[in-house]
From Swiss-Prot:
UniProt name for this protein: Pleiotrophin
Subcellular location(s) of the protein: Secreted
Gene giving rise to this polypeptide: PTN
Database matches in InterPro entries: Midkine_heparin-bd_GF (IPR000762), PTN/MK_C_dom (IPR020090), PTN/MK_C_dom_sf (IPR038130), PTN/MK_diS_sf (IPR020091), PTN/MK_N_dom (IPR020089), PTN/MK_N_dom_sf (IPR037122), PTN_MK_heparin-bd_GF_CS (IPR020092)
Chain residue ranges for the region called Chondroitin sulfate binding: 90-97, 121-129
Record PANTHER family: PLEIOTROPHIN, PLEIOTROPHIN FAMILY MEMBER
Organism in which the protein naturally occurs: Gallus gallus
Entry's family note: Belongs to the pleiotrophin family.
Length: 165
């Protein structure tokens, strides 16, 4: 019997602890005030429009760009941002536009130029870039391949000269 009484006391204690925990949780939830949901404030501000990057020195490297936006209740309508123009980009297509170029084509004998095409890889800050561009450059020296026989004759001639000396 004493063992049954001990089990009843443990069960009663556990039950009281459970009731106490539930009461504590319900009072803390009741004490919280329901916060009214924040209204989603729609901004009257427009999207930022950025100028091209203007290098501080020269035509590449660190520089700044100006940003503007419109809106009646905008706190900020203009701002300046630091930017960088990589010095290895082809500036003739715009410093904001990066192209992936194919290999140089064959030399056009009529124009003495070879060309290659570049596809737009990246446009910084919504720059207006052409999708594809083409560049040309002079072919350089056009040399006719010399026949192998003449090289052999020259080598043989030099060998004979050394023997005579």
């Amino acid at each position: 019997m004493p063992q049954q009484q001990q089990q009843r006391r443990m069960f009663t204690a556990a039950l009281l602890a459970l009731v106490f925990i539930l009461a504590a949780v319900s009072t803390t939830e009741a004490g919280k005030k329901e916060k009214p949901e924040k209204k989603a404030k729609k901004s009257d501000c427009g999207e930022w429009q950025w100028s091209v990057c203007v290098p501080t020195n020269g035509d590449c490297g660190l520089g700044t760009r100006e940003g503007t936006r419109t809106g009646a209740e905008c706190k900020q309508t203009t701002k300046t941002q630091k930017c960088k123009i990589p010095c290895n980009w082809k500036k003739q297509f715009g410093a904001e536009c990066k192209y992936q170029f194919q290999a140089w084509g064959e030399c056009d004998l009529n124009t003495a130029l070879k060309t290659r095409t570049g596809n737009l890889k990246r446009a910084l800050h919504n720059a207006d870039c052409q999708k594809t561009v083409t560049i040309s450059k002079p072919c350089g020296k056009l040399t006719k391949p010399k026949p192998q026989e003449s090289k052999k004759k020259k080598k043989e001639g030099k060998k004979q000269e050394k023997m005579l000396d």
